Amino acid sequence: MKHLFAMAAGLCVSTFAFGQAASIPVGTALTIFENQKVVVVQTAKGPIEITRTMTACGKNGGVIQPLVPVPGIHPIGETEIIQALGNPKAMVVDMRDTNDRVKGTIPGSISMPYTEVVDRLGELGCTKTGSAWNCAEAKLVYAFCNGPTCPQSPIAFRAMTREGFPADKIYYYRGGMLDW
């Protein structure tokens, strides 16, 4: 895994710095686990096949988001996302706006754009009592957006916790679609 990360980082740097094409063609199937390019996760709705393909490195000028944007949130990687897809107590949430999601997403994730999350806390297991949310029985939320420079998930996390969602029930896949 360390070698894969180092190789991917090197490809991104060389592509960004020198404008050269990466040595792995876009669309090439990538290994998820050692000698495994496909993982099948059993969910309540049936099996979901997980694959990864090479994408062009992100070249946006965004600001790198903190690994822990709100105290108490858990940073995670691809393995935890895959495990969460099979966990009935968890939800994998794509917090990007709909225009980004239609270009591709993590199979089995639900769409909950960051601008809508506060109005949709009920879908995450919270109940509304008057004007306040009670999130004591909330699901574990495994959330992602476009990648390390994307502010959409961190914005949603701040709004969620401000409304009473427990930070320790939020798992942040900061690598997002850039790493996926």
What is each of the regions a protein language model found here?
Residues 6-15:
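Bacterial N-terminal signal peptides
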Residues 63, 104-109, 163-165:
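Short helix-loop-beta junction
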Residues 74-139:
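Mid-length scaffold segments of soluble, non-membrane domains
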Residues 126-180:
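Catalytic cysteine-centered active loop of the rhodanese-like fold, especially the PTP/DSP P-loop
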Residues 18-92, 98-103:
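Flexible, polar/low-complexity N-terminal or interdomain linker segments that lie immediately upstream
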